[in-house]
């Protein structure tokens, strides 16, 4: 009985700390493939790569922007589709073809006058692990790589934004 109370108390404390951390956020950085897409790529016979972005994610990004959060895309892959999606959403920062994600993220923070404490990152794969020291909140989708799921602060259980 006492152990159950302690567990509930700890979860309330963790939720309080998480809410406090969320209030400090000014920048949300999103990986693209596997976060804003399902991770699959279609390739045409001519070699063109096609990605599918979900409209609901776009709405969620716009709502976050309206709430005053700066949203940026950061991807290891170079993609015209990603850059077009960023333009459509009115994102000022779309970094593609990035080989060193922590350095690129730290540079973006400097440009915006922000610290890691004001930054959250959503990633899905092993190449997203190195950003951990430069963000306050590391998050991943439920189907992310297991090593990433083990170290994140939160796992997104669904791909849909809830109002």
Predicted feature descriptions by range:
Residues 24-26, 69, 117-118:
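Short coil/turn segments at beta-strand junctions that form active-site/ligand-binding loops
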Residues 36-66:
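A positional/architectural concept
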Residues 47-54, 81, 88-89, 93-95, ...:
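Mg2+-dependent phosphoryl-transfer enzymes with acidic/Ser/Thr/Gly-rich catalytic loops
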Residues 23-40, 132:
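Asp-based phosphoryl-transfer active-site loop
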Residues 5-7, 12, 48-51, 96-97:
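Short, flexible loop segments at the rims of nucleotide/cofactor-binding pockets, characterized by
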Residues 11-14, 57, 101:
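Amphipathic coiled-coil/heptad-repeat helices and related helical stalk/stem segments
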């Amino acid at each position: 009985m006492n152990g159950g109370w302690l567990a509930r108390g700890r979860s309330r404390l963790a939720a309080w700390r998480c809410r406090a951390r969320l209030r400090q956020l000014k920048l949300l950085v999103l990986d693209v493939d596997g976060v804003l897409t399902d991770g699959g790529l279609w390739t045409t016979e001519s070699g063109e790569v096609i990605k599918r972005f979900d409209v609901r994610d776009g709405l969620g990004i716009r709502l976050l922007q309206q709430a005053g959060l700066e949203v940026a895309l950061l991807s290891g892959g170079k993609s015209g589709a990603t850059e077009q999606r960023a333009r459509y959403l009115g994102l000022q920062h779309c970094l593609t073809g990035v080989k060193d994600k922590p350095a690129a993220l730290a540079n973006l923070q400097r440009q915006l006058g922000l610290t890691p404490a004001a930054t959250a990152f959503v990633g899905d794969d092993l190449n997203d692990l190195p950003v951990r020291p430069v963000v306050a909140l590391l998050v991943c989708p439920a189907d992310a790589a297991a090593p990433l799921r083990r170290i994140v602060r939160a796992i997104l259980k669904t791909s849909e934004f809830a109002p």
